[in-house]
């Protein structure tokens, strides 16, 4: 009788531990990776664009230092390039080829890794040219160059 009671108690604890194990990963699964957050920003850029073709991620700058809070805005910098896919097709940009001589845009701003909050603040400017193998864009009198070179 005593062993039945102990077995029943152990079974309850096992059940609680199993439920806890199922709940904890699902809570952390709501956090995006830095790359996923940027890809979501590219999707938003394509949704809000009035241009004929979709843009696809071309280059992603280094992520900022790790921050434990997925809701804290993270600085982001990336480059997108025009693809051959027309915007109305709603095809995932990752499946589209880059357009030869397509437009290139440098994007900067902030993203969050929280799937629920999702505030984005991204500004993209068309790259003005190539200097020594690096993409350059200008805002007023100031030019920024990114990439290798």
UniProtKB/Swiss-Prot annotation:
Question: Which keywords accompany this UniProt record?
Answer: Amidation, Antibiotic, Antimicrobial, Disulfide bond, Secreted, Signal
Primary subcellular site in the record, as a coarse category: secreted
Does the record's keyword annotation contain Isomerase?
no
Q: List the disulfide bonds.
A: 85-96, 107-124, 136-145, 138-143
Query: Residues bearing Arginine amide?
Result: 148
Task: Give the function comment from the record.
Answer: Microbicidal activity.
Any single Gene Ontology cellular-component annotation: extracellular space
- Name assigned to this protein: Protegrin-4
- Give the originating organism: Sus scrofa
Q: Which InterPro entries match?
A: Cathelicidin-like, Cathelicidin_CS, Cystatin_sf
Could you tell me which residues belong to the region Disordered?
61-80
> Which is an annotated GO molecular function term of this record?
lipopolysaccharide binding
Q: Where in the cell is it found?
A: Secreted
Family, per entry? Belongs to the cathelicidin family.
The residues forming the signal peptide are 1-29
Q: Which GO terms describe its biological process?
A: antimicrobial humoral immune response mediated by antimicrobial peptide; defense response to Gram-negative bacterium; defense response to Gram-positive bacterium; innate immune response
Top-level lineage group: Eukaryota
């Amino acid at each position: 009788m005593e062993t039945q009671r102990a077995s029943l108690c152990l079974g309850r604890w096992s059940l609680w531990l199993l439920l806890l194990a199922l709940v904890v990963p699902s809570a952390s699964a709501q956090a995006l990776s830095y790359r996923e957050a940027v890809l979501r920003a590219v999707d938003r850029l394509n949704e809000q664009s009035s241009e004929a073709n979709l843009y696809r991620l071309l280059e992603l700058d280094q992520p900022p230092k790790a921050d434990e809070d997925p809701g804290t805005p993270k600085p982001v910098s990336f480059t997108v390039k025009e693809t051959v896919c027309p915007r109305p097709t709603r095809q995932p940009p990752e499946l589209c080829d880059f357009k030869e001589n397509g437009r290139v845009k440098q994007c900067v701003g902030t993203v969050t890794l929280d799937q629920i909050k999702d505030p984005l603040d991204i500004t993209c400017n068309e790259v003005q040219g190539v200097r020594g193998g690096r993409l350059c864009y200008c805002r007023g009198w100031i030019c920024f160059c990114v990439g290798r070179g």
